[in-house]
């Protein structure tokens, strides 16, 4: 899990530190910078995956625009001003992503290489990590000359020495247990063989913003798999879950949670092998036998949003760390509160970490602020226009007599307009 994120010089953010839990809810005025925080994290993820072209940024949910609009406009704009995102995981893995853009036509953001980048890899992941990194360095050696070539050769020799030690079960000391490297080039794609490691989860970070049209058109698939940021790929994903023995029971568990909807009875997903139908069957307890079942086209959009959220949180096939922008969209206020409570349980059970933004006060009532893994943040802008963040905590030893939704509406939490 990600423990801490620091952001500098990104859009409305001059400098900010964010300490995360497992489920994190952002509230704040329109334009306060909630989405800017999410986009800065997604930009770091794109840098970690070495995919900084605009088409890859958009696929992650980033509003890619001119470089001068990506940098903070709160100071004099210059190509020399870099965007910085520093990430620390709970296992103390840490990276700093320094990004620059030369503002030339058709150019893309570049990750500034730092000679003191550190990475820690432990246990059985060590050999896999070193083999992948060595293959990358040997390929890179074929494309460089001069001083860079000598640096790479020295790096390769050091890596080969570490790899020999790591393969030796009788070796004692650091190489067998924990490795720290100072590299001249990118190591992000090889950090943490496990998809659940902190920095691997940054690489996968997406900003989901499901759309009604994408959820209803089950034949549409997105650039990102298994689930696109607007909900693309949901039908195929359900088919995979339903047919894969390794994920037996996941669809049944999703179906059980969908009973938050009073009318809902059951869900049937056609097999990918035996059916050419791109639709699911939804049982409504109020429908007569003659009327049959609903499909995704005739169902209400709230059902589709819940189906997407529960699918996203219920399996290791989806990212470990992600955001959902406007999680309250299309949902009844009371349902929003129950949804957040359900997502907190699913996140804990399936190793997920999420940031949710909302404008619906009722959403907050699903949070248990006595649980340190569930956190509420108010996003605002100061007199200079800088985005600021404040965590709302339950006072120790004191039970709240007011619902969070009421505290939000009455202005006790902040995050409301002050100009009217």
Predicted regions, residues:
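Short loop/turn elements that form and flank the Walker-type P-loop nucleotide-binding site
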Residues: 1, 14, 19-21, 317-318, ...
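Pre-Walker A-like glycine/lysine-rich segment at the N-terminus of P-loop NTPase domains
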Residues: 1-50, 56-69, 76
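Residues immediately C-terminal
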Residues: 12, 329-330, 363
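Phosphate-coordinating catalytic segments in nucleotide- and nucleic-acid-processing enzymes
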Residues: 48-308, 312-317, 395, 407, ...
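C-terminal lobe/lid and adjacent interdomain/linker elements of RecA-like ASCE P-loop ATPase modules
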Residues: 56, 60-61, 71-78, 338-420
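Walker B catalytic acidic pair
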Residues: 325-326
